[in-house]
Design a protein with these regions (language model features):
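Terminal, low-structured helical/coil segments at or just beyond the last alpha-helical repeat
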Residues: 15, 164-198
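Structural signature of tandem alpha-helical TPR/SEL1-like repeats
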Residues: 34-43, 68-80, 101-114, 136-148, ...
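TPR alpha-solenoid repeat register
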Residues: 57, 91, 125, 158-159, ...
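Alpha-helical segment of the N-proximal tetratricopeptide repeat
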Residues: 20-50, 63, 67
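Structural marker of alpha-solenoid helical repeat scaffolds
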Residues: 50, 84, 118, 151-152, ...
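Canonical tetratricopeptide repeat
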Residues: 26, 60, 67, 94, ...
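Residue-level recognition of tetratricopeptide repeat
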Residues: 54, 88, 122, 155-156, ...
């Protein structure tokens, strides 16, 4: 009995040093930030083995899969998030980006339209939808989406994107105006969409 009692503190200490699902998520975030995408995927997968209901783990792993060009795996992870939380707007935009990367622009547009119905003032949705509309040669819709972004959070990359649409439409004066605004205005160069995550 004394042996069991003596071993108990060691067992307890060993249990407290085992990484949790949250710790694996943090490790994955660190690995990805440091440019080690493969290790990030491994950490997120370990987090999900410990807690298969951890939607943040699926979303994070899906983002890394997307970065790696593993679009089918990314799509599966984003769909898993949406299965459990159909109101997760960021998962819709990530899923739509995956569809667009696979060349499925019509379905990407449908997903983004659904997301905009859930959160009509989310800049990332308009920016993504503008790009999809551009790829579908729906230039008026692309201009409308990019203008919505500019009205909410002006950034040089959005002016450049809208300028590219105007060029395709043959509206070179408007295109030049947007390109010049992107160069000279005191606005951020890029949208910081990650600071807008819900």
């Amino acid at each position: 009995m004394k042996k069991i009692i003596c071993l108990f503190p060691f067992l307890l200490a060993a249990c407290t040093t085992l990484p949790t699902s949250s710790e694996y998520l943090l490790r994955g975030d660190g690995y990805f930030k440091d440019g080690h995408a493969g290790k990030a995927v491994q950490s997120y997968t370990k987090a999900l083995k410990l807690n298969p209901d951890n939607l943040e783990g699926y979303a994070s792993r899906g983002a890394v899969y997307f970065f790696l060009g593993e679009y089918d795996l990314a799509e599966a992870d984003f769909l898993r998030v949406l299965q459990d939380n159909p109101y997760q707007v960021d998962a819709y935009t990530a899923y739509a980006s995956t569809l667009a990367a696979k060349g499925d622009f019509e379905n990407a547009l449908s997903v983004l339209n659904l997301a905009s119905g859930l959160k009509p003032d989310k800049v990332e949705i308009f920016f993504s939808r503008g790009g999809v509309n551009f790829m579908l040669d729906r230039y008026e819709d692309a201009v409308r989406d990019y203008t919505s972004v500019i009205n909410l959070h002006p950034a040089a990359e959005v002016y450049n994107a809208r300028g590219a649409v105007y060029m395709k439409m043959g509206k070179t004066d408007l295109a030049e105006k947007d390109f010049n605004t992107a160069k000279t205005a005191k606005i951020p160069e890029k949208l910081n969409i990650y600071s807008m995550v819900d």
